[in-house]
Structure formats: C-alpha cells, structure tokens
C-alpha cells in the first residue's frame, strides 16, 4: 500500500498557507489490511480511518459513478486496484487534484500547479457537472482564497451553465449548504456575489438574493477585527442589516442554529434602536421584548459588544443614539419590573398592559423620545 497527501492540504502548502488538517489517500489496500495495520475505522459505511499515532485521516482511493440526482447520487468503488489518478480525477478542481507522495514528490496529472500559479479555478474533469454541490464549493473556494484573487476558467463557467439547466441545484440539502456558508465566512460577500454571477444565487439562496446589497462589501471582511472574530460573531456581522421581517426566512435558508439566531436577532434589534431616528417607544419595546434582551443579560451584553465591533469595522455609520443610554434603559426596566409596581394590587387582566406601559414610559424618558 502507498500513502499520498492530497486535496486542500497540498493546495494550501503550495500557496504558502499552513494547512489546518491533512488528509491522505491510500492506494493498493483493502479495509482489512488497514485494520490489520492498526488504523481505526471512523465511518460505518465508508473506508475512512484514523492513523493510530498521528490521528490524521486516511481514506482508501476511490472512483465514483453518477447514478441518481443530487449530492448522494453516486456509486462508489473502493477497490484496491483504483489508482491515484483515478482518485484525483473525481475531485472538483485542478488545484485540489494534486498529491504528494512519501518522498515529497508532487504528483500533478491535471496541471493544478499551473492553475495555482495563474490563480485560476478550473474543473478537473467533465465529471464536475455530475455534482451540484461543486458549484457552491467553487464559490466557497473563491471566498476562502480571496487574498489570492482567483478567477474562474471560461470552460468551467460554460460547464456550470449546463449544470444549472439540468435542475440539479434544486437537490442540494440545507445541511450541506450551511456547511459551505460557514466555510465561506472568510469573505461571504465574495461567496454570494460569485453565486449571483454564476446565476445560481436565486436558486440556492433566494432570500439572500433579495438582500445581497445589505451584506457589507468585501473590504469589510478583510478588516482584522472581522477576521479575528469567532464563527457566531462573523455570522452576525455579515447579516446585521437583514430586515427583521426577513430574519426567519434567512434563518431557514442558512440553517442557522438557535445560538446564531438569538445573537443575530438581538444585534439587529440593537442596531435598529440606536440608528433609526423615527422609531417609537412602543417599537423599541417590541424589539427588546422579542429579542429577549431584558431577561437575558448575557445576550444583551454580547449583542451590544458585537454591535460596537460592527461600528469599528464599518466606520461610515454614526448611531443616532448612545448605546450607554440603551444600557441604562434596559437596566431601569429590569429594576422597574421588581420595584415600581405592587403587582398584588393590579387585576390580572390588566397586569400585562400595565407593565408594558411602564416599560414604554421608561423608554421614552431614558431615550428622550
């Protein structure tokens, strides 16, 4: 059996990037032989193994044959007679179809090194058209490698147009699209804009297509403050200007987690309260209530800090109101709900409206509305 370093790790090394993970392909081996050599299988229906010492992933070389629609519609062959070139040929782009053997020799049957040097994203083979996810991955690589300014090969653009006509993009799952979106957070504007240029955005992310202009420009995502943020923060910073009425649709489309959704919703509420000159006290009350930033002090603090971070990155926005006044308002409301009312003396059917009016009066006073 022979081992080859493949895929993104090789690409990144050739670009001068330290790879986060290293994936290996094994040629000339069976599953039983891998187990006999101490490798640990990690997938029930897929021959992927963990090296007993390095803990890196090793997969048997494979070929693929299209049998049905969608991302999973493939027949896979893991025979020990599959060659390295067979395995590399099934990969999406030439820059991902390069291998390095155990003697550090680069094996590049599809001229991926030339495309790396010329900053071109080019499909490895005509099989590119068989997997609709590859269109999304192409946009993701353009975003992920945005510092290198890759362009897409003309013949690949032509192939993508053919793929779109087949309707295959409609078979992509939200789970897979979420994974690609998160991986594209290095520069999501490039990710979505590339999909738009490929005429795929309206098919894959129709709601994002409607609010694309509200996502910051690509220079926003090149700011060190953004780059140093965690995934939860990056998602919120990217989508902070999404209208409240579109938020639930965006959540479903991007398959945002509860954590993502709560943080984004609270941050959007804070943004609107501080920036909207014409907002009313009742609208502010509904925003802070729906975003749960009265009860959840940690959520309020995290969202407010994230909004401050947004202002530092996007220095063209000047809030109409001081965030410290909002902080004082929230604290006053919390204390008022305990101290300013004798709840026992208020009829139950009037308690909710009485509390609501108290909060609105506090908002008016504190924010000078």
Swiss-Prot record:
Gene3D superfamilies associated with the record: Beta Polymerase, domain 2 (3.30.460.10), cca-adding enzyme, domain 2 (1.10.3090.10)
Keyword Iron-sulfur attached: no
Catalytic reaction(s) noted: a tRNA precursor + 2 CTP + ATP = a tRNA with a 3' CCA end + 3 diphosphate; a tRNA with a 3' CCA end + 2 CTP + ATP = a tRNA with a 3' CCACCA end + 3 diphosphate
Chain ranges passing through the membrane: none
GO MF entries: ATP binding; CCA tRNA nucleotidyltransferase activity; magnesium ion binding; tRNA binding
Stored InterPro entries: CCA_bact (IPR012006), NT_sf (IPR043519), PolA_pol_head_dom (IPR002646), PolyA_RNA-bd (IPR032828), tRNA_CCA-adding_enzyme (IPR050124)
Enzyme class name: transferase
Binding site for ATP: 8, 11, 91, 137, 140
Claim: Cell inner membrane is one of the keywords in the record: no
Known EC number: 2.7.7.72
GO BP terms, alphabetized: RNA repair; tRNA 3'-terminal CCA addition
Requisite cofactors: Mg(2+)
Keywords in alphabetical order: ATP-binding, Magnesium, Metal-binding, Nucleotide-binding, Nucleotidyltransferase, RNA repair, RNA-binding, Transferase, tRNA processing
Cystine bridges: none
Residues bound to CTP: 8, 11, 91, 137, 140
Annotated binding of Mg(2+), by residue: 21, 23
Leftover remarks: A single active site specifically recognizes both ATP and CTP and is responsible for their addition.
Entry similarity comment: Belongs to the tRNA nucleotidyltransferase/poly(A) polymerase family. Bacterial CCA-adding enzyme type 2 subfamily.
Job description of the protein: Catalyzes the addition and repair of the essential 3'-terminal CCA sequence in tRNAs without using a nucleic acid template. Adds these three nucleotides in the order of C, C, and A to the tRNA nucleotide-73, using CTP and ATP as substrates and producing inorganic pyrophosphate. tRNA 3'-terminal CCA addition is required both for tRNA processing and repair. Also involved in tRNA surveillance by mediating tandem CCA addition to generate a CCACCA at the 3' terminus of unstable tRNAs. While stable tRNAs receive only 3'-terminal CCA, unstable tRNAs are marked with CCACCA and rapidly degraded.
Protein name: CCA-adding enzyme
